[in-house]
Swiss-Prot record:
Catalyzes the irreversible cleavage of the glycosidic bond in both 5'-methylthioadenosine (MTA) and S-adenosylhomocysteine (SAH/AdoHcy) to adenine and the corresponding thioribose, 5'-methylthioribose and S-ribosylhomocysteine, respectively. Also cleaves 5'-deoxyadenosine, a toxic by-product of radical S-adenosylmethionine (SAM) enzymes, into 5-deoxyribose and adenine. The keyword Magnesium does not apply. NCBIfam families: MTA_SAH-Nsdase (TIGR01704), PRK05584.1 (NF004079). It holds the Pfam family PNP_UDP_1. It catalyses: S-adenosyl-L-homocysteine + H2O = S-(5-deoxy-D-ribos-5-yl)-L-homocysteine + adenine; S-methyl-5'-thioadenosine + H2O = 5-(methylsulfanyl)-D-ribose + adenine; 5'-deoxyadenosine + H2O = 5-deoxy-D-ribose + adenine. This is 5'-methylthioadenosine/S-adenosylhomocysteine nucleosidase. Signal peptide: none annotated. It comes from the Bacteria. Keywords: Amino-acid biosynthesis, Hydrolase, Methionine biosynthesis. GO terms for biological process: L-methionine salvage from methylthioadenosine; L-methionine salvage from S-adenosylmethionine; nucleoside catabolic process.
Length: 231
């Protein structure tokens, strides 16, 4: 069984990389791939770079070259639900684009023509992640929609515009929908696990810098427990 884990930034992948046995790293088109083993499971760790284009390029390379059975997209996100706080973890039920608008041609908001409006996370991976959560103390975990766009959400007006578009929105970030779209096209099951480094619209740039490391620790802790359970 081969599992891929994708994070955008060094802070989001460094803990897991340091835990891989027999690790080997190669860089293709500025995308960093590290292969190794964790608790008997073959892992491909991808540092994708920030944003949807980087995520799409790197995920395509990942799925074509390494052919993983499952994909986990991890890292940080901005919280969108009123019950959430910095450090909490969100598990995706589905993932959507929040900066795609072809509604003039009768598509749903966020829908890329010819593709689904929402990319559903794999039920098995969601279930395994929920089981793994029970082993974590002091971390609140929620499950819902994660939305993606190529912008950092520190404009309160834009936050409200996006919130009004999606009824069950829990987090926003800059890569997950691109990862999910590529996984859909390759028919590869995925789930997104994101820890909150900020709450969207509330001095986001300040809290992001302060809490990115904490978010990376929380998301990685959960991913490691998922890997132990998945094989």
């Amino acid at each position: 069984m081969r599992l891929a884990v994708i994070g955008a930034m060094e802070e989001e992948v460094t803990i897991l990389r340091n835990k891989l046995e027999n690790a080997k790293t190669e860089t293709i088109a500025h995308c960093e791939f590290t292969t190794g083993e964790y608790e008997g499971t073959e892992v491909i760790l991808l540092k994708s770079g920030i944003g949807k284009v980087n995520a799409a390029i790197s995920t395509t390379l990942l799925l074509d070259r390494y052919k993983p059975d499952y994909v986990i997209n991890t890292g940080s996100a901005g919280g969108f639900h009123h019950t959430l706080n910095v450090g909490d973890v969100v598990i995706s039920t589905d993932v959507r684009h929040h900066d795609v608008d072809v509604t003039a041609f009768d598509y749903e908001y966020g829908q890329v023509p010819g593709l689904p409006a929402a990319y559903a996370a794999d039920e098995k991976l969601i279930s395994i992640t929920e089981e793994a959560v029970s082993e974590l103390d002091g971390i609140q975990v929620a499950k819902g929609t994660i939305a993606t766009g190529d912008s950092f959400m520190n404009d309160p007006k834009r936050v409200e515009e996006v919130r009004a578009r999606f009824s069950d929105l829990y987090a926003v970030e800059m890569e997950a929908a691109a990862v999910a779209q590529v996984c859909h096209q390759f028919k590869t099951p995925f789930v997104v696990i994101r820890a909150l480094s900020d709450i969207a619209g509330k001095e986001s740039h300040v809290s992001f810098d302060q809490f990115l490391e904490q978010a990376a620790v929380h998301s990685t802790e959960l991913v490691l427990k998922v890997i132990k359970r998945i094989h």
